[in-house]
Amino acid sequence: MENKTITINGVEYVKKNSVQQIEIDGEFMYIGKNYYIRTVTNHYVGKVVGLNDKEILLQDASWIPDSGRWSDALRTGDLAEVEPYPDRCVVGRGALCDYSEWLHDLPRIKK
């Protein structure tokens, strides 16, 4: 039986070829779904209506200057501050840090 780990200076390491490799291909963001998007400088909430390699087009979009407690905002949909766009906005994918599906009504009232 082949040994799958090695210990060096008291630290146990796993051999790379002993771990199952999973290839992931495709998109994780889908047109027609609502997302909370965090970029390097701003946060947005909106419905994705267009998507290409460089940009995301959001409908019923809002800029979120302050989400409040992050996990509470995602769980309840309650945001500390909301600045709605009149309709759409474009977010550059190059500035994207992360995004989460927004499972609540999109905020459309300034707060």
Q: Language-model features: where?
A:
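Conserved RNA-binding domains used in RNP assembly and mRNA/RNA metabolism
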Residues: K4-V11, K16-K111
